[in-house]
Amino acid sequence: MYLMKDITRDGAKVLRETAKPVTFPLSDEDKQLAHDMMAYLVISQDEEQNEKYHLRPGVGLAAPQVGQSKAMAAVLVPGDDNEILFKEVLINPRIISNSVQHAALAEGEGCLSVDKDVPGYVVRADRITISYQNEAGEHKKIRLKNYPAIVCQHEIDHLNGVLFYDHINKEHPFTIDPDAVIIK
């Protein structure tokens, strides 16, 4: 299981590189990576475990964030009443289509790899379709909207060497299209 000390911080070269594709069948090392990234998310979202291990809660974790230049990310988006909106390890993910409609989180975005607060709207597509492989190597395609779509775009950005604050308008950080969806 990963702890906060294992999270690669902003400034590390691996966070700005394009991650390498993952080959199948998965190596034991890649299986462990997938397991450990998802385990971090599960434990970080459990209040008691989070406190015990001094973790920052997360909804996504990409391999570059643990120092691995591999195109793999774990996503665990909780909903209301312990419902899970989306839980998957995405391997070699690609956004194959996106909506014209924009969206942003009202509170802005954060990142386990970025310790400072960076205020501003991170403007993203409100709806996306992604293709990826699961841990068994099966090719999948899924359509996501709102918060799960934003989380997946954030994680896929990590695999392309992009950090959330790269999307914030430097001159006017809270400027956004008036038709954009603001997710609270």
From Swiss-Prot:
Keywords noted in UniProt: Hydrolase, Iron, Metal-binding, Protein biosynthesis
Protein residues bound to Fe cation: 111, 154, 158
SUPFAM superfamilies: Peptide deformylase (SSF56420)
Enzyme class of the recorded protein, top EC level: hydrolase
Cofactor note: Binds 1 Fe(2+) ion.
GO molecular function: metal ion binding; peptide deformylase activity
A Pfam family matched in the record: Pep_deformylase
EC number(s) recorded for this UniProt protein: 3.5.1.88
Cofactor: Fe(2+)
Gene3D superfamilies hit by this protein: Peptide deformylase
UniProt-listed GO biological process terms: co-translational protein modification; translation
Active site feature: 155
The reaction(s) this protein catalyses: N-terminal N-formyl-L-methionyl-[peptide] + H2O = N-terminal L-methionyl-[peptide] + formate
Job description of the protein: Removes the formyl group from the N-terminal Met of newly synthesized proteins. Requires at least a dipeptide for an efficient rate of reaction. N-terminal L-methionine is a prerequisite for activity but the enzyme has broad specificity at other positions.
NCBIfam families assigned: pept_deformyl
Descriptive protein name: Peptide deformylase
Source organism: Lacticaseibacillus paracasei (strain ATCC 334 / BCRC 17002 / CCUG 31169 / CIP 107868 / KCTC 3260 / NRRL B-441)
Lineage of origin: Bacteria, Bacillati, Bacillota, Bacilli, Lactobacillales
Gene assigned in the entry: def
